[in-house]
Every structure is written in structure tokens, then in C-alpha cells.
Amino acid sequence: MSQAELSTCSAPQTQRIFQEAVRKGNTQELQSLLQNMTNCEFNVNSFGPEGQTALHQSVIDGNLELVKLLVKFGADIRLANRDGWSALHIAAFGGHQDIVLYLITKAKYAASGR
């Protein structure tokens, strides 16, 4: 997405571009997109048509780097998908131990108020 497109972004357009970048799983592309979308109306915790947030999709894909990036930009690890599963449930079920450990650490850190 070009700077010109980002400067005139609308919420639906921005969400669509964001969801597409998550599906691609390219961490560098998504980081650039998130940094450039700071002036847009944008919600990193929005639900896509499949009832998943970007964080849920990244966990399903087993992409720890993308999970970390999304959390850095405000993804809520406590949100449940349409089936009632949190990112931690999905990671455990999928056997993504690295993501499980990361999410537990983040949850403990958030619970301690730090």
C-alpha cells in the first residue's frame, strides 16, 4: 500500500488491507503497514469474516513473529473467536508451544499491572 493510499484510508478499506496482510503472514510487510496506519481509523482487534481476529489467525498459522508484532500494536490476547477460543486455546490445541509460552508470559505480565 502506498503512502497516498494510506493518507486517504477509510476504516473498511484499512481493515481489508490489514486482514489481507495477516493472511499473507509477512511480518515485515505487516509491520510497515501498522506503522503507516497510525493516522487511520483502525482496530487491530477487529474480527474478520471467519470470526477470528488477526491474532487468532496468526496463532492458527503458527507464526510467532506475527503474534509478537500484533501484541506490540495492541492485539488483545484475551479475546475469544466466534467459537469461544482465545489465542492461548488455539495455540495449545495446535501444538504451538512457542506461542503458548509467549502468550502465558504476556498474560502474566498484564495481570501483574506492568
UniProtKB/Swiss-Prot annotation:
UniProt cross-references to SMART domains, sorted A to Z: ANK
Protein's GO biological process: blood vessel endothelial cell proliferation involved in sprouting angiogenesis; branching involved in blood vessel morphogenesis; endothelial cell proliferation; negative regulation of Notch signaling pathway; negative regulation of T cell differentiation; negative regulation of transcription by RNA polymerase II; Notch signaling pathway; positive regulation of canonical Wnt signaling pathway
Keyword terms, alphabetized: ANK repeat, Developmental protein, Repeat
Keyword Repeat on entry: yes
PROSITE patterns: ANK_REP_REGION, ANK_REPEAT
ANK repeat segments: 50-79, 83-112
Pfam families in the cross-refs: Ank_2
Keyword Repeat part of the UniProt annotation: yes
Family matches, as Gene3D superfamilies: Ankyrin repeat-containing domain (1.25.40.20)
UniProt note: phenotype after gene disruption: Axial skeletal defects in newborn mice such as rib fusions, fused vertebral bodies and fused pedicles of the vertebrae; defects are influenced by the strain-specific genetic background. Embryos exhibit expansion and fusion of myotomes, dorsal root ganglia fusions and defects in projection of the spinal nerves. Embryos show increased level of Notch 1 intracellular domain (NICD) expression in presomitic mesoderm and somites. In contrast, fewer somites and vertebrae found in -/- are linked to a longer segmentation clock period.
Record note on quaternary structure: Interacts with LEF1.
Family indicated by similarity: Belongs to the NRARP family.
Job description of the protein: Downstream effector of Notch signaling. Involved in the regulation of liver cancer cells self-renewal. Involved in the regulation of canonical Wnt signaling by stabilizing LEF1. Involved in angiogenesis acting downstream of Notch at branch points to regulate vascular density. Proposed to integrate endothelial Notch and Wnt signaling to control stalk cell proliferation and to stablilize new endothelial connections during angiogenesis. During somitogenesis involved in maintenance of proper somite segmentation and proper numbers of somites and vertebrae.
Protein name, per record: Notch-regulated ankyrin repeat-containing protein
Species assigned in the record: Mus musculus
